[in-house]
Amino acid sequence: FVGCGVSGGEEGALLGPSMMPGGSEESWKTLKPIFESIAAKAEGEPCVTHIGENGAGHFVKMVHNGIEYSDMQLISESYDLMRRALGMTPAEIGDVFEEWNKTELESYLIEITADVLHQVDKKTGKPLVDVIVDHAGMKGTGTWTVQSALDLAVPVTGIAEAVFARGLSGQAELRAEAQKQDFEGPSGVVPMAEEDKVAFINDIREALYASKIVAYAQGFNEITEAAKVYDWKIDLAAVARIWRGGCIIRAKFLNRISDAFENGEANVSLLFAPYFKDAIETAERSWRRVVSRAITFGIPVPVFASSLEYFDGLRSPRLPA
């Protein structure tokens, strides 16, 4: 028996996906040359490995999708802050994402976000993003990731808030009724000097990276706990390596994640590995400014905020729960 999670969509089908097979070692020995021949390649290595026994492969693919939800919601919140608070156009925001893709944030999702924000709708002449209905659908894997985390008692707060954000976007009637209520609260572009605007954009970049690290830390924590409960032997460094190509969340910093697990630096949490600990501490003040200012501006940032709250919960010597 083999259950294989496959990521990459249409492009992966054509150019090679990231594959996460689960099942017996004997089955893997038979299928390995076939899977390695069709998988995507990253730095010359095939993006496929035997994940573990039974349903381990599909479980890891499920968590991959949960992380993807969080990743995309963080990008959306970054866009929303620049659009609503700073009054930037989609094309201007696309330029920002292009620059961010030259930094530690380099990833497929940042790249395609920049591309989409530069697109213009041919029929209306408006930015394409402005003619897309703001109701996000779900296929279920993000929900399953959260449900499984609840069963395992593992907090995946960023992923959960990303799922709920999609759920709220789909509550069309409720949202329409809320607009009629004309609730009190801040709205509109925030007057800001150019140098302050530039500084805030940099704060958003820092907050995005810190929150992204938390999303991956939470996802890998869920995989770790599931491996204990279901008696799977999962090589987390190998999982990070096969996500470097072919899949939706492929990103530059997956090399850092792989190294952290390989070196034993992330055995308890990815956040404790020296590189990621330093990155979080470097971004911490920017992260707090983004969340606090978003609240002041009346702009929802559920994944930014929940990721910061998770970090603060971890570092608290005593919790009131």
Spans of model-derived segments:
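C-terminal amphipathic alpha-helical interaction region
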Residues: 281, 286-321
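Short alpha-helical scaffolding segments that buttress acidic/His motifs in well-ordered protein cores
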Residues: 63-70, 96, 113, 132, ...
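Inter-helical turn/loop segments and adjacent helix faces that build the functional surface
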Residues: 82-94, 149-154, 229-232
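Hydrophobic beta-strand scaffold residues
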Residues: 1-2, 156, 301
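Rossmann-fold dinucleotide-binding core
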Residues: 1-95, 102-127, 131, 169-195
